[in-house]
């Protein structure tokens, strides 16, 4: 078992149902699910596979990034 890591994810409710989820710190690491819980379970698997691929290729594992919320008037 590897080192525990935490990543921020972006969970989006889709218009046609279900959820999509992505990991800003891991470009291209995305998944989806019918429910919020399923989408989160699927992204955990996707993150693990993504990191395993990086390790297999000798690439560095990105750390978490900082996410800030901003307010705009539009």
Please name every model-derived segment.
Residues 1-8, 41-74:
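Short, charged, surface-exposed hinge/linker loops at domain edges
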Residues 2-3, 9, 13-15, 33:
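Short, positively charged
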Residues 11-26:
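Short aromatic-glycine-(Arg/Gly/Cys) micro-motifs in beta-strand/loop hairpins
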Residues 22, 40-41:
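Short, surface-exposed helix/turn micro-motifs that flank interaction/cofactor sites
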Residues 27-37:
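A short, exposed loop/beta-hairpin motif centered on an aromatic-Gly-Thr core
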């Amino acid at each position: 078992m590897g080192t525990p890591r935490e990543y921020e994810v972006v969970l989006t409710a889709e218009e046609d149902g279900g959820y999509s989820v992505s990991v800003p710190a891991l470009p291209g690491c995305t998944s989806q699910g019918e429910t919020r819980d399923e989408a989160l379970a699927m992204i955990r698997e996707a993150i693990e596979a993504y990191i395993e691929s990086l390790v297999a290729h000798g690439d560095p594992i990105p750390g978490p990034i900082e996410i800030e919320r901003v307010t705009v008037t539009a």
